[in-house]
Swiss-Prot record:
It comes from Rhodospirillum rubrum. Its EC number is 5.1.3.1. Belongs to the ribulose-phosphate 3-epimerase family. It catalyses: D-ribulose 5-phosphate = D-xylulose 5-phosphate. Its cofactor is a divalent metal cation. Substrate binds at S10, H68, G144, F145, G146, G147, D175, G176, G177. The active site is at D37, D175. This is Ribulose-phosphate 3-epimerase. Catalyzes the reversible epimerization of D-ribulose 5-phosphate to D-xylulose 5-phosphate. Binds 1 divalent metal cation per subunit. The keyword Endoplasmic reticulum does not apply. The keyword Nucleotide-binding does not apply. A divalent metal cation binds at H35, D37, H68, D175.
Amino acid sequence: MTRAIRIAPSLLSADFAISRPRCPSDGRTGADILHFDVMDNHYVPNLTVGPLVCAALRPHTSLPIDVHLMTRPVDPLIDSFAEAGADMITFHPEASDHVHRSVQMIRKRGLKAGVALNPASPLSLLDHILEDLDLVLIMSVNPGFGGQSFIPSALPKIAALANGRRRACRGDRVDGGVNPADARALARPGADILVRLAIFGASDRAKAIASIRGAAESGLGQEAA
């Protein structure tokens, strides 16, 4: 059975000067998930948006909202984003004092829980937590800024995650610098969900999403071959 590739536009490139960024919704652009980047100017050197923006967007899209916490600490924000309408929360293990507790807090609220690994973070960080996770986010750029170039070392990490017992995690996703050429290479070793920053800035979002999805699916074809 062919794996389904899902595309997650990132709100980081949305135009917040308008009253409400035009959210992709089911059937209009082909997006599958809305990726919500949260930066605190402590864990990463940038500052973005918080739970109030998530709550304001929630009524305007039926897509699942995946909150990516690039914050330290993690735990105080979990309840706030759960109440704001998040469906998934992903955090960086280096930013949590007790990773298991953070995961348990997320799942107790009925949300999917994920861990994000920076480009230099080893997969061994997952060895004692993977069975409790719903997803793993592989960073193919360093967190904190948009517009960075894809870091190729993400590819062997994705392949290793997709094999053996590590595949117990249901959703392997990649965030950072993903263009159509990268999407093809990422899907082949096992990425299921691709986070794309530039979609909100595209003049034709449906076309931008179709381009990424088509490239990724061509990578799956090469995998099958």
